């Protein structure tokens, strides 16, 4: 079940939070449809801005839209012209006053949606799919909070006659563990051979007692190769034994 279901929906209220914050009785269906229109408008109109997430919060006469983006300069525009245009379009769509918040995503390689979008853009530019997938995995695993990643590409890979699915993963991605913080993102690459779907799962540790392991481990240095001078060199033990024999 954990392999099939959306990781965010499975963990709502446990490790993940809702992306729409509002309450409605009779207008529930209208608000849901409006949220979908807002997200579609932002994803299609700002496809080059690297939109990672859109959080919508509603009050009686106001709508607040938080846009998490990798390139805030594109969303803001010159002297805020693009942000004003987006605000006007959203006010026209919702019929209410819109407060627009643009938030920058600091760590691009640890965000599943941005990783999926990056792979899809490379596939659209005719980069080999294996190269794009492996490069994304290597970049993600260098981040201190990332403990595992899985990438799936499906479609006419490499222009093949028959579509197929390719999977690559590194580290742990426990999809059945509810306390696990799993980031999930999807994107479509439009190529001359057709569409190629990209899915990315990123495991960032567990959430224990309301504290995220990724936030605790973020400042610490990742366990890597370390300092070359701090490691024992090859033949170091043999040299020590030889010196001890000479002294003896």
From Swiss-Prot:
CDD domains: KH-II_30S_S3 (cd02412)
NCBIfam families (UniProt xref): rpsC_bact
GO biological process: translation
This protein's name: Small ribosomal subunit protein uS3
Compositionally biased intervals (Basic and acidic residues): 213-230
Gene from which the chain derives: rpsC
GO molecular function: mRNA binding; rRNA binding; structural constituent of ribosome
Positions of the KH type-2 domain: 38-106
Listed SMART domains: KH (SM00322)
Keyword check for Ribosomal protein: yes
Gene3D superfamilies named in the record: 3.30.300.20, Ribosomal protein S3, C-terminal domain
Keyword Coiled coil: no
Cellular component aspect of the GO annotation: cytosolic small ribosomal subunit
Region (Disordered): 213-248
Family statement: Belongs to the universal ribosomal protein uS3 family.
Superkingdom: Bacteria
Transmembrane intervals: none
SUPFAM superfamilies linked to this entry: Prokaryotic type KH domain (KH-domain type II) (SSF54814), Ribosomal protein S3 C-terminal domain (SSF54821)
Assembly and oligomerization: Part of the 30S ribosomal subunit. Forms a tight complex with proteins S10 and S14.
Pfam family, one: KH_2
Function: Binds the lower part of the 30S subunit head. Binds mRNA in the 70S ribosome, positioning it for translation.
Keywords: Ribonucleoprotein, Ribosomal protein, RNA-binding, rRNA-binding
């Amino acid at each position: 079940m954990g392999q099939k279901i959306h990781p965010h929906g499975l963990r709502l209220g446990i490790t993940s939070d809702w992306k729409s914050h509002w309450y409605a009785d009779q207008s529930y269906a209208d608000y849901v449809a409006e949220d979908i229109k807002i997200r579609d408008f932002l994803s299609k109109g700002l496809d080059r801005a690297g939109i990672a997430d859109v959080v919508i919060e509603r009050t009686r006469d106001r709508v607040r839209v938080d846009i998490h983006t990798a390139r805030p300069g594109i969303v803001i525009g010159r002297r805020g012209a693009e942000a004003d245009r987006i605000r006007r379009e959203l006010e026209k769509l919702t019929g209410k006053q819109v407060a627009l918040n643009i938030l920058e995503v600091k760590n691009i390689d640890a965000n599943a949606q941005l990783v999926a979008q990056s792979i899809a853009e490379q596939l659209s530019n005719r980069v080999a799919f294996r190269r794009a997938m492996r490069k994304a995995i290597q970049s993600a695993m260098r981040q201190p909070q990332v403990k595992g990643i899985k990438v799936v590409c499906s479609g006419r890979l490499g222009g093949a006659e028959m579509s197929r699915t390719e999977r690559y993963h590194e580290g742990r991605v426990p999809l059945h563990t509810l306390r696990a913080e799993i980031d999930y993102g999807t994107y479509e690459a439009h190529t001359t051979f057709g569409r190629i779907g990209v899915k990315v799962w990123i495991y960032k540790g567990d959430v224990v007692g309301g504290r995220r392991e990724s936030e605790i481990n973020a400042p610490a240095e990742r366990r890597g190769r370390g300092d070359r001078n701090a490691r024992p060199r090859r033949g170091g033990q043999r040299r020590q034994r030889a010196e001890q024999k000479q002294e003896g």
